Amino acid sequence: MTPWVLRTRYQKLVITGATNVKVYRKHIRNKDAFVFLGYVESKELEFLHKNAYAFVFPSLNEGFGYPPVQSMRYGVPVAASGTTSIPEVCGDAVLYFDPYSVSEIKNRMVQLLDTEIYDEYAARAPKRYVEVHTRQIADLEEAVNFILKV
């Protein structure tokens, strides 16, 4: 489950991912502030990455941590879980939180409403994307060269 905050005049928290949304809707006080999309196809996912005000990634079990990097490509600031591989992949371009702490997640989201913090992480985001992407290309070239030599 991934929350998105779209760049609109009245921001909404957009949540994607295959999940039982009825459980969440039942406990939400301000239902108009949330949009549950469930699973989305890659084109819609790309639209969300590109048009988000911020990307919040409370993952507990991420193998590589690529979703935050996808948002960084577009200069979208990210708040993400400080667990698994995410800090290794995202470096200092992300505001980290404990994914088990609702108050930490909320505090990071509120921090991104501060213009200075927002601008700082919006500037870091595409730089980190380029670093990760460049490293991936170099690793792929190395693997291809190794295979071709065998």
Q: What positions do the PLM features span?
A:
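Carbohydrate transferase catalytic cores enriched for Leloir-type hexosyltransferases
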Residues: 1-150
